[in-house]
Amino acid sequence: MFFLGQKKKTEEKKANHLEPAMLDQIRSHFEKIRHPVELIASLGEKPKAEEIHDFLEEIAGLSDKISITSKPDAERRAPSFSVARKGEDARMHFAGLPVGHELTSLILAILHAGGHPPKAEQALIDRIRDLKGDFHFETYITLSCHNCPDVVQALNLMAAVNPRIQHTMIDGKLFLDEIE
């Protein structure tokens, strides 16, 4: 099992997932974070676990308001991680590596968890907040899907606004056994 903070047996150079210009752009967006945000990792033993660990460290390194904790959870898919305002229950979950088209979904989830207001009409936000009942949505995505980010971002927005809504983005390629 791979844990956050664990050193690799070989001191190979970590591959950066993002280009320096992209990192600078994300860093500037993260300046809008008002409240501390946690990335809560449940990495398990699958091959992508170490890559997700490195990616989370890369993202957390862009703001002193973002921290990473390791919390193995038998109820969660592994490898996965959640985004939450520090001290609150996580409602936005990522089972896979949100890169490519899905990177924006992660950035927005972090911003919303950190208190940056969503860009949506107040009437829509009020309707989402007023939804009764508990909801847990799961979205299977592929990183080549051009429509998937819109769905993921809409459901993450709902989860950010209403504490009774949860959403999990699932990389279908990483969890093939669930979609076959």
Where are these regions (language model features)?
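Charged, alpha-helix-enriched surfaces in structured cytosolic catalytic cores
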Residues: 21, 98-101, 150, 174
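Local sequence-structure signature of Cys/Sec-based thiol-disulfide redox active-site neighborhoods
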Residues: 16-58, 129-167
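Acidic, proline-/serine-/threonine-rich low-complexity intrinsically disordered repeat tracts
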Residues: 11-12
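Non-catalytic, surface beta->alpha helical segment in thiol-disulfide oxidoreductase systems
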Residues: 2, 83-118
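N-terminal acidic, proline/glycine-rich, low-complexity intrinsically disordered segments
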Residues: 1-8
